[in-house]
């Protein structure tokens, strides 16, 4: 069994979700993976509003999985959005063209070898709030949401070092 990260569940605000997908220029040709998908909001938005080919959430928490599956059904994207139950360190993400995450800097650090090994050149990696140390972001944006300022980092595999 590999490392099981403890990342507190904090939902990404809807405005930030949209900007994360926009900064990655998500389109109908993309396969989006959200690592630690929580209630499924990123994959649902990717499927519903960006019409992606496929959106996959990876989640380990049973309560969050139930919530995400209910939200997928409620939003009518059952055919294009799905949940994989598991530890994102162990789930194969090699088909992804976009990976989104709202984890912690130390977890991002531990994920670097997996991302570099499994993702193809050109795959976009979007991190909400926490950078991936040692990688050069292609773009960094600030997103205001109420009285909170959020930072979104875009990395592109093959251009990240």
Curated annotation (Swiss-Prot):
Changing residue 11 to A: 23% of wild-type catalytic activity. Pfam families: Methyltransf_31. Induction: Seems to be expressed at similar protein levels when grown at 75 or 85 degrees Celsius, or in the exponential or the stationary phase. Keywords: Methyltransferase, S-adenosyl-L-methionine, Transferase. It is an enzyme of class 2 (transferase). A motif (DxGxGxG SAM-binding motif) lies at residues 34-40. It catalyses: L-lysyl-[protein] + S-adenosyl-L-methionine = N(6)-methyl-L-lysyl-[protein] + S-adenosyl-L-homocysteine + H(+). Optimum temperature is about 60 degrees Celsius. Is active over a wide temperature range, from 25 to 90 degrees Celsius. Has half-lives of about 30 and 10 minutes at 80 and 90 degrees Celsius, respectively. One of its GO terms (biological process) is methylation. The keyword Translocase does not apply. Its EC number is 2.1.1.-. InterPro entries: FAM173A/B (IPR026170), Lysine_N-MTase (IPR053600), Methyltranfer_dom (IPR025714), SAM-dependent_MTases_sf (IPR029063). One of its GO terms (molecular function) is protein-lysine N-methyltransferase activity. Gene3D superfamilies: Vaccinia Virus protein VP39 (3.40.50.150). Catalyzes the methylation of lysine residues in target proteins, using S-adenosyl-L-methionine (SAM) as the methyl donor. Exhibits broad substrate specificity, being able to methylate the crenarchaeal chromatin protein Cren7 primarily at 'Lys-11', 'Lys-16' and 'Lys-31', as well as a number of recombinant Sulfolobus proteins in vitro. Methylates lysine residues in a rather sequence-independent manner. Monomer. Belongs to the class I-like SAM-binding methyltransferase superfamily. This is Protein-lysine N-methyltransferase. It comes from Saccharolobus islandicus (strain REY15A).
């Amino acid at each position: 069994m590999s490392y099981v990260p403890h990342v507190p569940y904090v939902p990404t605000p809807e405005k930030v979700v949209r900007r994360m997908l926009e900064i990655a220029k998500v389109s109908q040709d993309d396969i989006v993976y959200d690592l630690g998908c929580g209630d499924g909001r990123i994959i649902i938005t990717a499927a519903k509003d960006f019409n992606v080919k496929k959106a996959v959430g990876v989640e380990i928490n049973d309560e969050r999985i139930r919530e995400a599956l209910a939200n997928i059904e409620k939003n009518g994207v059952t055919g294009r959005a799905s949940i994989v139950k598991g530890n994102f360190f162990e789930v194969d993400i090699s088909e992804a063209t976009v990976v989104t995450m709202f984890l912690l800097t130390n977890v991002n650090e531990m994920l670097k070898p997996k991302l570099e090994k499994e993702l193809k050149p050109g795959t976009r990696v979007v991190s909400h709030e926490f950078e991936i140390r040692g990688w050069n972001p292609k773009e960094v944006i600030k997103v205001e949401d109420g009285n909170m300022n959020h930072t979104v980092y875009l990395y592109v595999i093959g251009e990240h070092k």
